[in-house]
């Protein structure tokens, strides 16, 4: 009897491992919720090119922007749980959007976490016409003239909107929100001073900081960036607890077999945790940080709860 039980356990373990040993046997679809060219797309293509060779299968990046990234999420949530459809998961999809708009997916039940793989540096800048050279000076200016300063975002509920709303909440200030349809048109209005305050991705701001068209005040992340080690964070500038840590990860549909999840998670970590890859992505404000599936699941849960409180307190609504 014991021999039969042992043999059964061995066969069950072998059957569970088999999907991962044979995986992948056909091309993989990697759905990205943004257009080509930005930092998230760059990380997806780095993963794709890094794994396609060793796995001897194409990983096809499929850019599906739209509906605040929800379109891509819906595609993946409805896919077969066989490991052949991945979602480049921006943090807002699962932790912000469900709080501010109606979504057709459950952030906890409809996805399998695979790995967090990067953080994107966001910066607080002002137009040079704004007489503030630090976060403290900006806050003092905003307090002296409530509602006189304006700030841009790429839309209601966007990282820019959330990050600036969080600053207003922590600092007790009020600025006028000017939402745009995307970051590019907002930055086009920031450069001539039509909008005055902006929290946005470093890769889109660094050239303008360098040529003096915008003034850098602080990093919005929880800790200083190696890319800008002398730039203080907003938290260091008098607002402990402030953190706009924009992360990227990979998820799949719910119920993907654990051995496949483990293989994909390990493969992504192997591709990205290479000094040359990190050096290539760092100037774009991309900090590689890979985690286990379990750690990503905890991050999604924690950020969902944190953003829920901030969104409620700040009265943030979707479009």
What is the predicted role of each segment?
Residues 20-110, 148-150, 156, 172-201, ...:
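N-terminal (or domain-start) structured segment
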Residues 25-27, 169-170, 210, 233-236, ...:
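An extracytoplasmic/periplasmic, membrane-proximal ligand-sensing/linker region
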Residues 42, 46, 50, 71, ...:
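Extracytoplasmic/secreted proteins, especially bacterial periplasmic and envelope-associated proteins
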Residues 1-6:
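Bacterial N-terminal signal peptides that target proteins for export
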Residues 13-17:
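N-terminal signal peptide c-region/cleavage motif recognized by signal peptidases
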Residues 92-102, 161, 168-170, 197-231, ...:
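A ligand-binding cleft/hinge motif common to bilobed small-molecule-binding domains
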Residues 78-84, 91, 98-185, 234, ...:
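Hinge/capping helix and adjacent helix->loop/strand transition within the periplasmic-binding protein
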């Amino acid at each position: 009897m014991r021999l039969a039980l042992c043999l059964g356990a061995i066969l069950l373990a072998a059957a569970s491992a088999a999907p991962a040993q044979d995986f992948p046997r056909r091309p993989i679809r990697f759905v990205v919720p943004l257009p080509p060219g930005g930092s998230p797309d760059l990380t997806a293509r780095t993963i794709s090119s890094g794994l396609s060779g060793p796995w001897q299968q194409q990983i096809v990046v499929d850019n599906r922007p739209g509906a605040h990234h929800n379109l891509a999420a819906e595609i993946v949530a409805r896919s077969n749980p066989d490991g052949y459809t991945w979602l480049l998961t921006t943090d807002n999809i699962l932790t912000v959007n469900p709080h501010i708009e109606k979504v057709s997916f459950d952030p906890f039940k409809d996805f399998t976490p695979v790995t967090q793989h990067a953080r994107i540096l966001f910066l607080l800048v002002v137009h040079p016409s704004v007489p503030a050279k630090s976060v403290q000076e900006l806050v003092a200016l905003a307090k002296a003239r409530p509602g006189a300063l304006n700030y841009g975002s790429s839309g209601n509920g966007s990282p820019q909107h959330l990050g600036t709303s969080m600053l207003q909440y922590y600092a007790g200030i009020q600025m006028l929100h000017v939402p745009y349809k995307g970051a590019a048109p907002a930055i086009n209005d920031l450069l001539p001073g039509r909008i005055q305050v902006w929290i946005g991705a470093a890769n889109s701001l660094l050239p303008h900081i360098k040529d003096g068209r915008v003034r850098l005040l602080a990093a919005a992340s929880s800790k200083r960036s190696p890319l800008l080690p002398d730039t203080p964070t907003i938290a260091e500038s008098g607002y402990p607890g402030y953190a706009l840590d924009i992360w990227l990860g990979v998820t799949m549909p719910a119920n993907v077999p654990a051995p496949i999840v483990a293989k994909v998670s390990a493969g992504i970590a192997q591709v990205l945790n290479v000094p040359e890859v990190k050096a290539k992505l760092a100037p774009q404000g991309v900090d590689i940080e890979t985690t286990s599936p379990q750690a990503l699941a905890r991050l999604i849960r924690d950020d969902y709860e944190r953003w829920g409180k901030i969104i409620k307190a700040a009265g943030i609504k979707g479009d």
